[in-house]
Amino acid sequence: MKKVYISCYSNEHQKYKNTLLDYGKNKKLFLTNFSNEKDFDFLNTNNTDDEIIKSVKLKILKDSDVSIFLIGKETSSRKIIDWELRASMINYGVLKNCGIIVVYLPEITDEFKEKIPRSVLPEILYKNISNPDCHIVETTWNRINKEVGHLEKLLNLALCYKDLSKYKIDKNIKIKNSSKYNMF
């Protein structure tokens, strides 16, 4: 059974995360690794960038096969999302990189319809989606919600892609939260 980590920024998005968790549990589709913002309290300003990412990999993502990122209006501005993405992209000891699924939430699709700008994404994700050597799965919440079996297809696809993807991880780790959208 796949191990899945679901990243969401705010309490407003928790309902989407809970829906995915319930669906996964009911269908026996995946096991989850959980976290909340307090789980990141072990990190402090004395940690180096590498220590932060490795700690997130070891203590938060653990042995996840796939990471699902719920993308809302504030997601790109959050440092913890940046850390989770970077930790999802690295191999560290026996812990391998994760397949990545991006789910655009209704607050994004309602505003932008089908022409979602890359600026809604965290920078590290934007750069890797644009990289032909990376295979990141994208979908919308509406599609997952309407199409039975869509999530299972996405999980299987992301799992296949994880070993093919050559993520590029820059040194621009986010050390504090920033404004709403990235400007590249």
Give the location of each predicted region:
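Arginine/glycine-rich "motif VI" loop of SF2 helicases in the C-terminal RecA-like domain
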Residues: 89-98
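Short beta-alpha junction loops
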Residues: 98-116
